[in-house]
From Swiss-Prot:
UniProt name for this protein: Envelope glycoprotein gp160
Region annotation V3: where it falls in the sequence: 308-341
Any GO CC annotation of this UniProt entry: host cell plasma membrane
CDD domains, alphabetized: HIV-1-like_HR1-HR2
Disulfides per UniProt: C53-C73, C118-C217, C125-C208, C130-C160, C230-C259, C240-C251, C308-C342, C388-C457, C395-C430, C609-C615
Topological domains annotated Extracellular: 32-695
Region feature V5, mapped onto this chain: 473-483, 475-483
Post-translational modification: Highly glycosylated by host. The high number of glycan on the protein is reffered to as 'glycan shield' because it contributes to hide protein sequence from adaptive immune system.
Organism (species): Human immunodeficiency virus type 1 group M subtype B (isolate JH32) (HIV-1)
GO biological process: clathrin-dependent endocytosis of virus by host cell; fusion of virus membrane with host endosome membrane; fusion of virus membrane with host plasma membrane; positive regulation of plasma membrane raft polarization; positive regulation of receptor clustering; viral protein processing; virion attachment to host cell
């Protein structure tokens, strides 16, 4: 009875255990997540890539060659697309922007390339015999008018004669040319006082001892033309639209564009010309306001117009300085001989300074703001230098930066209008230089040929470059001076709100969908989603931003469009048989875009996801990558946030997907070996029938061989027993009728089982009998073997079950014995402890009583002693 109860309880426990295991398997299968690949997700990362240019084809004169080579740029998009990214915050840093470095290198390359075919003026590095060319020698001199500008000083121009090689190398002739006095330096041994008095006559060009002077080509133009920097396919430009953005930190109003706005590459110092304006108020930007070595870039809200002019009319002539080379110099200066100058409205300038001071006071609280002139250095830094109509002006900006602003917002102009033509206009005296130290690098100089006629240009001052004096912080005055010279700050003032990002079209995320492995059926791709635009859903949650096809299509279409633009640009310059900087950048951008596209497609192909936007995999999602639930991921996170979370595990996930796909391909290859069994119709093909015939012949041959072997063995066995083999000609007894049972007269009924078979006639009959006997033999042997195995398994199962029951009963018995022993031991210990405790308590009780009886014993002793 006890054994039966144990068996029933065991079966009950087995049933419940099976149910619990099934429930656990179902729950584990329901919660299992799998990696899913998405192509076209709105995710980007900061990158430094090759940008190409776009320019308006009608923005320049086709007759002249502008130094910016914008004819090699692609045409601007008449309808540029700008997609606002909702709920997106992006970090910018204008001081560490690769776009600035790239533009700087591009402008340097353009200048170098434009001057490369031009004439080197090395033959002019000879001794010049010069005399002053003053305005008193010209009969056409006029007086200074009220429009501003001082009369040209005597000695401002030098009339120099020199010996030069003609078109015939061994022939030298004497020529003369006019140079500005700041373009030549004396080379005699006169003292400094003589040089100061300017009474020397022997000169040389200023840069002959340090630089190679290159004359700008005659038809070259330095007029700035807006250049749009564009990102290649697979990349994008992120733009910050915050109106008070200081250039660093997070920006909440973000959009994506393919090209920047038109940036005019104006090469100037101190003042930023013809740039972009602030929208709401003046903005000052600096990498660190507390570091006086850092330049402060000021962006104005409203422009200040500066009108510059060279009043005199100039003509030029050409001097041959060798075979195929010519030097252009000033032939005659006529008309108004006033000095070149620039005019600025005083009230407008003072109002601008007041706005700038208000912004500076937020950084330098309770300080007196002082604007002072440049502290010294190269002429390009000390003066406001820029290009006006092809001539390089160097203007004294002291009158612009010569004021003190007290903490109560009052100001004091230290010079006032003493040096101006009136109270309403600030006139800056300018001088013109023809030999320019190249701002790109040391050791190069350029000679700008004189421009004929009068020169007038009007520009907008849109920003300033300031530096702050260092010193004791206890000083209550902060002095700011005009700066510049590093053209990166000029480009940075326009590119501060842009950054280049690389679009990461591939994304992985967990889903409940698992790839059906070893499935060769092709399914069409369909997505019921609304396409919001390129990266337009970057701020939406992962479940709501199903804009995958937009990025995928625009990437390929962008490559094709860029290729067409490149071919059009190359076609326009094919007569030159060379590419400009922009053409090379076009090629680089094209190759880069194709490489990125092919790389993504290669990964998709390796993962078995070619042509799919959503691709499930057989890779289980590891909770160590991210333990968030599906609801937290798909309903609350954007793709950008999700990408940042799993960025450290992306390469590992990619590797696992590749390994899983490789394993699946191996499984498919093995399955193809069994694929011919998938259709029964293939069994009836002629190829299979030939195999069937071959197999049949082999089987028949094997049976015949076995028959022969068995026959020989039977004969040998019977011979050994004393029998002789019967002749094959022995006839069988005639079969009897149904009314006569076989056997002898004494015997009746059916035939007993004979030990030997019948002898038959004919090949087919023999084959049939042999085949039948072989099949029966095989069947009997297999049946016996199966019965033996079944008996053994049954016996082992019964013995095993009995052994298990025995061990279970034995375990229960010894468990009960151990339990009883433990209880007995516990009881014995408890009894022993109780007895010991009683003895201790009795001893303590007796001792206590003895102590209590001590006074009584003392009293009794005293009583006995007294008696």
């Amino acid at each position: 009875m006890r054994v039966k109860g144990i068996r029933k309880n065991y079966q009950h426990l087995w049933r419940w255990g099976t149910m619990l295991l099934g429930i656990l398997m179902i729950c584990s299968a329901a919660e299992q997540l799998w990696v899913t690949v998405y192509y076209g997700v709105p995710v980007w990362k900061e990158a430094a890539t090759t940008l190409f240019c776009a320019s308006d084809a009608k923005a320049y004169d086709t007759e002249v060659h502008n130094v910016w080579a914008t004819h090699a740029c692609v045409p601007t998009d008449p309808n540029p697309q700008e997609v606002v990214l909702e709920n997106v915050t992006e970090k910018f840093n204008m001081w560490k922007n690769n776009m600035v470095e790239q533009m700087h290198e591009d402008i340097i390359s353009l200048w170098d390339q434009s001057l490369k075919p031009c004439v080197k003026l090395t033959p002019l590095c000879v001794t010049l015999n010069c005399i002053d060319w003053g305005n008193d020698t010209s009969p056409n001199a006029t007086n200074t008018t009220s429009s501003g500008g001082e009369k040209m000083e005597k000695g401002e121009m030098k009339n120099c004669s020199f010996n030069i090689t003609t078109s015939i190398r061994d022939k030298v002739q004497k020529e003369h040319a006019l140079f500005y006095k700041h373009d030549v330096v004396p080379i005699n041994n006169s003292t400094k006082d003589n040089i100061k008095n300017d009474n020397s006559t022997r000169y040389r060009l200023i840069s002959c001892n340090t630089s190679v002077i290159t004359q700008a080509c005659p038809k070259i133009s330095f007029e700035p033309i807006p250049i749009h920097y564009c990102a290649p396919a697979g990349f994008a430009i992120i733009k910050c639209n915050d109106k008070k953005f200081n250039g660093t930190g997070p920006c909440t109003n973000v959009s994506t564009v393919q090209c920047t706005h038109g940036i005019k590459p104006v090469v100037s110092t101190q003042l930023l010309l013809n740039g972009s304006l602030a929208e709401e108020e003046v903005v000052i930007r600096s990498e660190n306001f507390t570091d006086n070595a850092k330049t402060i870039i000021v962006q104005l809200k409203e422009p200040v117009v500066i009108n510059c002019t060279r009043p005199s009319k100039t003509t030029r002539r050409r001097i041959h300085i060798g075979p195929g080379r010519a030097f252009y110099t000033t032939k005659q200066i006529a008309g108004d001989l006033r000095q070149a100058h620039c005019n600025i409205n005083r009230a407008r300038w003072n109002a601008t300074l007041k706005q700038i001071v208000g912004k500076l006071r937020k950084q330098f609280v309770n300080k007196t703001i002082v604007f002072n002139r440049s502290s010294g250095g190269d002429p390009e830094i000390v003066m406001h230098s820029f290009n006006c109509g092809g001539e390089f002006f160097y203007c004294n900006s002291t009158q612009l930066f010569n004021s003190t602003w007290l903490s109560n917002s009052t100001w004091n102009d230290t010079e006032g209008s003493n040096n101006t033509g009136g109270n309403d206009t600030i006139t800056l005296p300018c001088r013109i230089k023809q030999i320019i130290n190249m701002w790109q690098e040391v050791g190069k100089a350029m000679y700008a040929p004189p421009i004929e006629g009068q020169i007038r240009c009007s520009s907008n001052i849109t920003g300033l470059l300031l530096t702050r004096d260092g010193g004791d912080n206890q000083n209550e005055t902060e002095t700011f001076r005009p700066g510049g010279g590093n053209m990166r700050d000029n480009w940075r003032s326009e590119l501060y709100k842009y950054k280049v990002v690389k679009i990461e079209l591939l994304g992985v995320a967990p889903t409940k969908a698992k790839r059906r492995v070893v499935q060769r059926e092709k399914r069409a791709v369909g997505i019921g989603a609304v396409f919001l635009g390129f990266l337009g859903a970057a701020g939406s949650t992962m479940g709501a931003s199903m804009t995958l096809t937009v990025q995928a299509r625009l990437l390929l279409s962008g490559i094709v469009q860029q290729q067409n633009n490149l071919l059009r640009a190359i076609e326009g310059q094919q007569h030159l048989l060379q590419l400009t900087v922009w053409g090379i950048k076009q090629l680089q951008a094209r190759i880069l875009a194709v490489e990125r596209y092919l790389k993504d497609q290669q990964l998709l192909g390796i993962w078995g996801c070619s042509g799919k936007l959503i691709c499930t995999t057989a890779v289980p999602w590891n909770a160590s990558w991210s333990n968030k639930s599906l609801e937290e991921i798909w309903d609350n996170m954007t793709w950008m946030e999700w990408e940042r979370e799993i960025d450290n595990y992306t390469s590992l996930i990619y590797t696992l997907i590749e390994e899983s796909q490789n394993q699946q391909e191996k499984n498919e290859q093995e399955l193809l070996g069994l694929d011919k069994w998938a259709s029964l119709w293939n069994w009836f093909t002629i190829t299979n029938w030939l195999w069937y015939i071959r197999i049949f012949i082999m089987i028949v041959g094997g049976l015949v061989g076995l028959r022969i072997v068995f026959t020989v063995l039977s004969i040998v066995n019977r011979v050994r027993q004393g029998y002789s083999p019967l002749s094959f000609q022995t006839r069988l007894p005639a079969p009897r009728g149904p009314d006569r049972p076989e056997g002898i007269e004494e015997e009746g009924g059916d035939r007993d089982r004979d030990r030997s078979g019948q002898l038959v006639d004919g090949l087919l009959a023999i084959i049939w009998v042999d085949l039948r006997s072989l099949c029966l033999f095989s069947y009997h042997r297999l049946r016996d073997l199966l019965l033996i195995v079944t008996r053994i398994v049954e016996l082992l199962g019964r013995r095993g079950w009995e052994a298990l029951k025995y061990w279970w009963n034995l375990l229960q018995y010894w468990s009960q014995e151990l339990k009883n022993s433990a209880v007995s031991l516990f009881n014995a210990i408890a009894i022993a402890v109780a007895e010991g405790t009683d003895r201790v308590l009795k001893i303590l009780q007796r001792a206590f009583r003895a102590i209590l009886h001590i006074p009584t014993r003392i009293r009794q002793g005293l009583e006995r002693a007294l008696l």
